[in-house]
Amino acid sequence: LMISRYSRKELVSIWSEENKYKIWLDVEIAAAEAMEKYKIIPKGVASLVKKKGKIKVKRIHDIEAKVKHDVIAFLTSITEQAGLKARYLHQGMTSSDVLDTTLNIQLVQSGNILLRDIDKILSVLKKQAKKYKLTPCIGRSHGIHAEPITFGLKLASFYEEFKRNKLRLKDAIENVSTCAISGAVGTFANINPKVETYVAKKLKMKAEPISTQIIPRDRHAHYFAILGIIAGSVERVATEIRHLQ
């Protein structure tokens, strides 16, 4: 749950219920397109759902309150709008195929915003480091005045740290850019592996090499560990600025 006064509009939008369900729909439509291509379901399902399926958050919640299952509630809502042909959606899939693929897409979307932020930070730090390269200030050891340095050197240090952060974040985004459309235990028992390949390409992701019911969580742990490192860098800059006062 995001606290509104501390949240950015772009990120609130990415993690909103409406965007989550929109991505669910994108995943289901992509899977349906693949199933049509490989003659698993009748032609026209994907185009029908794309045309008539709308995200109705309140209706999904109302259905979920009765059926106690989020994906069933979502699919029921879409079927109400698109008609019985929509019953072919989700064939051979498991809920986590949709949930985990969507989570990773949201992480990629958020990460790309943070990458743009880092680029802005780098631009400012580079400019200011050059501007103040000869401006003297005190260096500190254990927080105590030590020997003179320049303010530009301090900013250059921040610049190099955020260069490393950019590389780390790009790697984390790449690492979490996987999807899984592999069924209840990841064995493709009731779904053609070609469906997963199609969905991955359609959504600009990579197929998870080996999944179980879920996408392995070490990918997410790595992503959030990198966010923690970046947060530490931001804190370092803030503390250094405070010490200048």
Residue ranges and their predicted role:
Residues 165, 213-245:
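Glycine-rich anion/phosphate-binding loop at the beta-strand->alpha-helix junction
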